[in-house]
Structures are given as structure tokens and as C-alpha cells.
Amino acid sequence: MTLFAVLGAMTFAAKYAMAFLPNIEPVSLFVMLFAVTFGKKAVYPIYLYVAMELLFFGIGTWNIMYLYIWGVLALAAYGCRSMESSLGWAILSGGFGLLFGAFCAPVDLAVGGVGYAVSKWISGIPFDLAHCAGNFVIALVLFKPMRRLTERLYSR
């Protein structure tokens, strides 16, 4: 459990350290790593990270999105856990970043209706593109070495 607590806190700290870059974050990489390394136990570091976001930044509609959006990525990554290609992981992570606004749309629809959800999604496209590019590059460069490190830490 200590490892999961440290990894959840590390995810929060790493995102916060990169906050000056719009929609470029390491959280997607960590969620994928946790899913492929820990399986079902990935919920511990993932939702510790979500709890820290809620405690640090307060409550908003994005909290609802975070309750399911990281689980979607974790399930996708777990389904691809046997994939060896760095490019494949980069495509998965980049695709998730590109679709992030779409994944948020159901909550926006419930909160503000169709007009609000559509306008928010469209206005967020430049940020989704940045999210896509950032996720792609981060996963392409770091997924394989970080996977080896995470697996080594978990085996101890």
C-alpha cells in the first residue's frame, strides 16, 4: 500500500509541476503504467490522485469527470497490456488526450444542456490537440523505461 500511496502522490506532484504547460501532463502516462503493472490494484494510486486533486483544488464538475475518465484510460491500457510497441502506447495516450473533451461531454451535457456541452467541447479543441501532442510525446519517450521501473518496484 505504501507504494500505491507514493505513486498517487507522485502523480499529483508531477501534474502540478507541469501545470504551467496547458493540457500537457504526465497523468495519462502514470494511469497507463499503473493499469498494466498493477491490474485491478491500479485503482489505489489513480483514485488517491483524484482525491488529492479534489482536496487541493476544491469541488467542481471536473471532479465527476475524473471519477470515470481515468478509469476509461486504465481499462483501455489494461486491455493493451501485452503491447510492446512504444508507438502503440503513444497512439493510445495521444488518442485519449484528443478525446478528453468528448469524455467530459456527458457531464457537461447533464450540467448545462446540449448548447453548453457542444460549445465547451468545440472551444476546448485547441487544448485537446495540445493534450494529444503532449501525451503522445511523453508516452513515446517514457512509457517503456517507466514500465520497466514500475514493474521492478512492484516486484519488490
Summary of predicted features, one role per range:
Residues 43-55, 88-98:
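Central hydrophobic cores of alpha-helical transmembrane segments
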Residues 1, 40-45, 82-88, 117:
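Membrane-helix interface segments
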Residues 10-13, 17, 30-33, 37, ...:
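Residues within alpha-helical transmembrane segments of multi-pass membrane proteins, especially transporters
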Residues 12-25, 48-83, 112:
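Interfacial aromatic-anchored transmembrane helix boundaries in multi-pass membrane proteins
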Residues 63-67, 85-156:
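Membrane-embedded alpha-helical hairpins and interfacial helices in multi-pass inner-membrane proteins
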Residues 1-33, 37, 41-45:
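Hydrophobic transmembrane alpha-helices
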Residues 36-39, 76-84, 144-151:
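Structural signal for the C-terminal ends of transmembrane alpha-helices
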